[in-house]
């Protein structure tokens, strides 16, 4: 049963990155895959508390990199255990990123990102 949750959460991470992030669908797909009280730590940035704080920080990050998000083209490495997942994302022309996420009821409650 736990493996089913990991599989669902990994698919949700694909949707989050490939649809929500790549298309800047902040209030739709992006928000849907996070809890309202999500805590996110992006390496080198202050942590955010709550989905709106996280969205605002990601909008600012995208603006600081030219106004278009660096596209996540694939997750060549993805695994999980219990309520946790880890994905390595290929970024078009920019290397890789890593996201470790703790899931609660199908949404990210804690997230750690290295870009």
Functional labels for PLM-detected ranges:
Residues 1-115:
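C-terminal and inter-domain tail/linker signature
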């Amino acid at each position: 049963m736990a493996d089913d949750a990991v599989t669902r959460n990994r698919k949700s991470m694909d949707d989050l990155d490939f649809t929500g992030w790549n298309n800047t669908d902040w209030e739709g797909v992006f928000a849907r895959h996070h809890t309202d009280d999500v805590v996110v730590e992006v390496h080198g940035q202050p942590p955010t508390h709550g989905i709106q704080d996280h969205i605002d920080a990601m909008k600012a990050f995208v603006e600081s990199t030219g106004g278009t998000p660096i596209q996540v083209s694939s997750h060549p490495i993805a695994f999980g255990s219990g309520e946790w997942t880890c994905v390595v994302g290929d970024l078009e022309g920019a290397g890789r990123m890593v996201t470790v996420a703790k899931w609660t009821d199908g949404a990210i409650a804690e997230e750690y990102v290295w870009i």
